[in-house]
A protein has these predicted regions:
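Residues at the starts of beta-strands that form the adenosine-phosphate
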Residues: 19-21, 120-121, 194
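Conserved beta-loop-beta/alpha segment of the NTase-like Rossmann-fold superfamily
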Residues: 34-139
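Well-ordered alpha-helical segments embedded in enzymatic catalytic cores
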Residues: 5-9, 81-84, 185
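Catalytic-core segments of class I nucleotidyltransferases/pyrophosphorylases
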Residues: 93-97, 102, 106-115, 127-130, ...
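N-terminal glycine-rich phosphate-binding loop and ensuing alpha1 helix
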Residues: 1-39, 69
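Short phosphate-engaging motifs
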Residues: 28-32, 77-78, 131, 168, ...
Length: 230
């Protein structure tokens, strides 16, 4: 829709009143930095006096965001990026998400679920649609029904929207540049019974491949984007 997917994710959080962001950058960090550094002027009505180089801003259309762009290294994996952000986040609960998926996640419900659980980390669980359509078949071969890509009833995946307590940093070693958050840290949190799940029954879609981008763009252009809750 003409905006980075990161912008869409931030708009979802901002809808619920969360406007303080830390973006952990790596590859193409200069592109992300340029986008936010120039965001104010790109979204303002201005008068430019070319003889004096004076710029007068009449009105801006920016969100009330405070965005910290924190470079964590080109090749650092997810756990290492999170660990490096500890110095910025401090000793407070925080939300964590990947930069490649959008959904109509009820952030308030997610946070409430997390607080009620008493766990140190809550992930958003989502039932994906099946890869193929399913048939209902009688013993004599008669097809009784056909379901187009039904949700897989016994399969839940990590949709990448987390609420974390600062204790999660204890599960990430200092030397963690080659460690994925989803591997040792998250598995060990689960092993210790400290990982909670919030089941999201609405819309969620990752943008892993070109077709995903095309599908999401089509939804946006047709004004049928379920994640546009703002």
């Amino acid at each position: 829709g003409g905006y980075p997917i990161l912008w869409h994710i931030m708009k979802i959080d901002s809808h619920y009143g969360f406007n303080d962001f830390v973006v952990l950058t790596g590859y193409k960090q200069e592109v992300i930095k340029d986008y936010f550094v120039n965001y104010y002027m790109a979204n303002s009505d201005v008068t430019v006096d070319l003889s004096t180089n004076e710029v007068v801003v009449h009105r801006n259309h920016c969100e009330p965001w405070k965005v910290t762009l924190f470079y964590t290294g080109r090749n650092c994996l997810t756990a290492g990026r999170i660990k490096k952000a500890q110095s910025i986040i401090g000793n407070e609960p925080f939300m964590l998400t990947y930069g490649d998926g959008v959904g109509d996640i009820d952030i308030n419900a997610l946070i409430k679920n997390h607080k009620n659980s008493g766990k140190i980390c809550t992930l958003t669980a989502y039932q994906p649609e099946g890869r193929w359509g399913a048939l209902g078949i009688e013993e004599d071969g008669t097809v009784t029904n056909f379901s187009e890509k039904p949700k897989e009833s016994n399969l839940w995946i990590n949709a990448g929207y987390f609420v974390c307590e600062p204790e999660i940093f204890d599960y990430i070693p200092d030397d963690s540049e080659n460690i994925m958050w989803e591997h040792e840290p998250l598995k060990n949190i689960a092993r210790d019974g400290k990982l909670n799940s919030y089941k999201h029954s609405g819309f969620w879609h990752a943008m892993d491949m070109l077709k995903d981008k095309q599908d999401l763009n089509k939804m946006w252009q047709e004004n049928k984007a379920p994640w546009k809750i703002w």
